[in-house]
């Protein structure tokens, strides 16, 4: 059976070296995590699979790695300075602080009904309730207290402050002087670096529409209440595509990317039953979006967003371009008085300039890792009554592809053979190959089941020509154990390379 709780996954991640709390020896930094020896391999494998699919295997995509430090004007004209904020509320009794919409989602139905009545919101729509509360914050704080809104930390009704907005961007200063002129931000998303480089990429590659720019990188959001392990954190990684299309073709390409991304996640090992496409209703759409479909996943803590695919129209390039009036921008954008470049596309047939629409598939790397771990976690009862935990990861994503294990660690002939074999398998370029000489083959198998290693190769007495029957007929053969079935076969080392290539290459 899969993980019964998020705590079960967290325990496995720490015990086996996937993910650690950052700065743990100093009490930890809330909402920040470090990837350990196995976690970094899993995360890198996921990113490489995404890059291979979306850049190498396509003829309409270019890559980019934009800087984390972001010019203030980029985030001013994108709208982040004014709108990148979440509603926040405090409990005066416990001194705890919560994001308002998350807090309300956790309330009993009778509490919410009292709030709807108090805020005069007729339709029981949580989004509409939050909007009404933010428009009348003083009234909302009193209504929350009167309605008996519960504090998740104590389980008791709270004494709530008026809700207010909190901008989630991390500020910093570039250079030795901390003044308004040197203000910059750690980027809250990777997308803006793509938009401001649109003309650079277009000029360098001579791309024709439709085409995309792909990027994987860190982003930073000062979340009010980071929670659920690596699901909602303050430092995270994104895999984003900005796919530029002609106006009028945007709805087709939006549908295309929703299906493409759903298919890819299934190919990574997530079951279709756990992936739920969710079409955002108009009241939930971001200010820039014409349409957004979220791919939700059934995490141990609930159904939550794994990836979003948004039709951003011409908002982004229209926000950052010069000559806005001449380009017929359809989205509502700030008047740009600073941009030095025209971020537009010239139709090769008509010679007319226009601002392309953008389709954005945006996935969280950390959420992807969490989904893979949750999906793969399996607790099995064995025929002998014992129990094992196995991570049934897609073999190509597994942190360790092959474990090479000498049957005993006190026979140099066996250990040296195993080391040579490890080097030979590593040269295949299939990923990490681990040599392990713990001396207890049974415990080694269980340990590698738990971290998802698809194949364990054992070097024994037969391998070095010292079979119990006194023959050398099994010389240069090894035992190969399958993680999922626990079945073992014997292969000649010359056959082993082809066997592993067939099962571990993309």
Curated annotation (Swiss-Prot):
Annotated GO biological process: glycyl-tRNA aminoacylation
Organism, scientific name: Thermus thermophilus (strain ATCC 27634 / DSM 579 / HB8)
UniProt-annotated binding residues for ATP: 221-223, 231-236, 305-306, 364-367
Enzyme nomenclature, EC number: 6.1.1.14
PANTHER family: DNA POLYMERASE SUBUNIT GAMMA-2, MITOCHONDRIAL, GLYCYL-TRNA SYNTHETASE/DNA POLYMERASE SUBUNIT GAMMA-2
Record has Ligase as a keyword: yes
Spans through the membrane: none
Protein known as: Glycine--tRNA ligase
Compartments, record wording: Cytoplasm
Protein family membership: Belongs to the class-II aminoacyl-tRNA synthetase family.
Top-level lineage group: Bacteria
Keywords: Aminoacyl-tRNA synthetase, ATP-binding, Cytoplasm, Ligase, Nucleotide-binding, Protein biosynthesis
Class in the EC hierarchy, top level: ligase
Reported function: Catalyzes the attachment of glycine to tRNA(Gly).
């Amino acid at each position: 059976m899969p993980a019964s709780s998020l705590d079960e996954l967290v325990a496995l991640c720490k015990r086996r070296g996937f993910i650690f709390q950052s700065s743990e020896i100093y009490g930890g930094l809330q909402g920040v995590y470090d990837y350990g020896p196995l976690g970094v391999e899993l995360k890198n494998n996921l990113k490489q699979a995404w890059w291979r699919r979306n850049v190498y295997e396509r003829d309409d995509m270019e890559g980019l790695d934009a800087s984390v430090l972001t010019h203030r004007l980029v985030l001013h004209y994108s709208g982040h300075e004014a709108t990148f904020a979440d509603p926040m509320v405090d409990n005066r009794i416990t001194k705890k602080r919560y994001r308002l919409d998350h807090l309300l989602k956790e309330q009993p139905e009778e509490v919410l009904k009292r709030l709807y009545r108090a805020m005069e919101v007729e339709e029981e729509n949580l989004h509409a309730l939050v909007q009404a509360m933010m428009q009348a914050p003083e009234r909302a704080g009193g209504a929350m207290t009167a309605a008996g809104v519960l504090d998740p930390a104590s389980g008791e009704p709270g004494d709530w402050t008026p809700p207010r907005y909190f901008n989630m961007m991390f500020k910093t200063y570039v250079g030795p002087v901390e003044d308004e002129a040197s203000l910059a931000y750690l980027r809250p998303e990777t997308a803006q670096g793509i938009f401001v480089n649109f003309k650079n990429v277009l000029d360098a590659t001579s791309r024709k529409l439709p085409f995309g720019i792909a990027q994987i990188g860190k982003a930073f959001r000062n979340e009010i209440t980071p929670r659920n392990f690596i699901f909602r954190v303050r430092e995270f990684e994104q895999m984003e595509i900005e796919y530029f299309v002609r106006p009028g073709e945007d709805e087709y390409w939006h549908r295309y990317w929703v299906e493409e991304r759903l298919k890819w996640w299934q190919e990574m090992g997530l079951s279709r039953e756990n992936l739920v496409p969710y079409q955002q209703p108009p009241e939930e759409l971001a200010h820039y979006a014409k349409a957004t479909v979220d791919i939700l996943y059934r995490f141990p803590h609930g159904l939550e967003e794994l990836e979003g695919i948004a039709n951003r129209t011409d908002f982004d390039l229209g926000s950052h371009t010069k000559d806005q009036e001449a380009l017929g921008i359809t989205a509502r954008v700030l008047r740009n008085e600073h941009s030095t470049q025209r971020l537009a596309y010239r139709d090769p047939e008509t010679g007319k300039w226009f601002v392309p629409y953008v389709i954005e598939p945006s996935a969280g790397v950390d959420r992807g890792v969490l989904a893979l771990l949750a999906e793969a976690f399996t607790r099995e009862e064995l025929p002998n009554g014992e129990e094992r935990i196995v991570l049934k990861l897609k073999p190509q994503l597994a942190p360790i592809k092959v474990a090479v294990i000498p049957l005993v660690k006190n026979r140099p002939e066996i250990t040296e053979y195993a080391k040579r074999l490890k080097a030979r398998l590593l040269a295949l370029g299939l990923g990490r190959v681990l040599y392990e000489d713990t001396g207890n083959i049974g415990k080694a198998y269980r340990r590698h089941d738990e971290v998802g290693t698809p194949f364990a190769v054992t070097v024994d007495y037969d391998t070095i020509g010292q079979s119990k029957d006194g023959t050398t007929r099994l010389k240069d053969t090894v035992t190969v154990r399958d993680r999922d079935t626990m079945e073992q076969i014997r292969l000649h080392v010359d056959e082993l390379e082809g066997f592993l290539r067939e099962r571990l290459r993309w």
